[in-house]
Amino acid sequence: MGNYPEAAFKLILIILCISGLLYANSSSERTFSITRPPVEKDIVEETLIDLQAPKERVSSLNRWIRSASGVTQVDPMLLVCLLHTESRFRKEAVSEKGYRGEAQTKRFSEFSSVNILEGAEILRDKLSLSKGDMFEALARYKGGKDKEEARKQAREVLKLYKIQLERRGLWNRQ
C-alpha cells in the first residue's frame, strides 16, 4: 500500500495530461493566454528546433508542451525556454539534487508528457505565488527567490525567452 499515493498521483497527472491534449486539440485552443494572444505559425515548434531539441522528439515535445500550456495556461514559449535550461529536453536528465526528467522535478514519470505537465503546474503555482512576476516565479522554480544561483538561472531563462520572442517578432507584444 506504500505506493498507492504515488500511483494515484501518476494516474491523476496522466488523466490531466490526456484532458489537456484533448483541450489543446479542440477548436477553442487558448494556449498563450498569460502573456500574449495566439499567433498563426507554430512558434513552439520553431523554438524547439532553434534550441536544438532532439529532432526525433520535436513533434512530441511540441504536443506535450502545448497540452501542458492548455491545462495550466502558462505560455508555451516560456515552458520551452524553461525546459531547455533545465534538461536540454532530455528525459533521462538527472540533477545533482536528484531531480529528474525534462522539467527536473521531484516527481518523475516514465511519460515525458507527465513530466512536462508537472513542470508547467509547478511554474503556474510559482507564478501565482509571485503574483505574476516571471522573474520571481522562475527563481522560485530554480531553487528559491532569495538564492543568488536561482536568480542567475531565472535571468538566463528570461533572456532566452526574450531572444526567442524577438526572433519571431513577438517581443513588442509584451
Regions found by a protein language model. Name each.
Residues 6-7, 23, 67:
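Residue-level detector of intrinsically disordered, flexible termini
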Residues 1-14:
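N-terminal Sec-pathway targeting helices
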Residues 10-12, 19, 152:
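Catalytic-site microenvironment of enzymes
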Residues 15-16, 65:
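Small-residue packing motifs within transmembrane alpha-helices
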